[in-house]
């Protein structure tokens, strides 16, 4: 049987142009308040990203993805690791990729493609800031951020994935049945989002 790993190599980074100082990430995850006082919780952003993903999939006549708590744990651990060690990539500084993280988390994914092949998982990443004034997408588009609430953060994350061909293909892959979303928020307001599929 052929194993096919879906690995979107181009990680999407929402770059913050105005009013955002470059700071090292905090070493612990925080719950952040934006300038207007809205509390941004990692779990609420994860839930809202999941809802937004399923809204978009429904628009494309695709089945919704079930929430998988174990896969969410794998995703959360990766987001927290990126925050803690100050990187943004599918592979950790030690070379661990999403399939190794699945294995370490005790998660096995085998989504049939045919009688002879299957997918073993997939991953999308996003890095954004809930106080950003301008977002620069991977495709070069610059748009006013204008988001303050967790729902607006979730919408911007999913919109960013939809404007990146590899991330879009992952998000709209009809074979996926479930996903886990993991979110970590740094003291500087940066938000790391990992989306893992099976």
Predicted regions and their residues:
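A well-ordered secondary-structure block
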Residues: 98-187
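Short, well-ordered surface patches within globular domains
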Residues: 29, 40-109, 168, 174-180, ...
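Short, low-complexity, Pro/Ser/Thr/Gly-rich segments in the mature regions of secreted, periplasmic
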Residues: 188-198
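Bacterial N-terminal signal peptides that target proteins for export
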Residues: 1-10
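Bacterial N-terminal signal peptides
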Residues: 9-19
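Bacterial Sec signal peptide processing site at the extreme N-terminus
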Residues: 21-31
């Amino acid at each position: 049987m052929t194993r096919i790993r879906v690995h979107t190599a181009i990680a999407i980074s929402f770059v913050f142009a105005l009013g955002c100082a470059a700071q090292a990430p905090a070493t612990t995850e925080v719950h952040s308040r934006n300038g207007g006082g809205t509390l941004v919780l990692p779990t609420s952003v994860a839930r809202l990203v999941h809802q937004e993903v399923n809204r978009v999939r429904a628009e494309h006549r695709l089945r919704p993805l079930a929430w998988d708590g174990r896969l969410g744990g794998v995703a959360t651990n990766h987001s927290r690791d990126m925050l803690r060690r100050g990187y943004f990539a599918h592979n950790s500084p030690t070379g661990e990729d999403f399939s190794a993280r699945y294995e370490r988390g005790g998660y096995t994914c085998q989504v049939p493609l045919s009688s002879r092949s299957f997918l073993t998982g997939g991953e999308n990443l996003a890095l954004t800031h809930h106080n950003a004034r301008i977002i620069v997408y991977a495709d070069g588009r610059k748009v006013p951020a204008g988001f303050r609430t967790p729902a607006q953060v979730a919408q911007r994350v999913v919109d960013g994935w939809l404007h990146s061909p590899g991330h879009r293909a992952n998000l709209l892959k009809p074979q996926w049945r479930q996903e886990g979303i993991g979110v970590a928020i740094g003291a500087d307001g940066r938000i790391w989002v990992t989306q893992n599929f099976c």
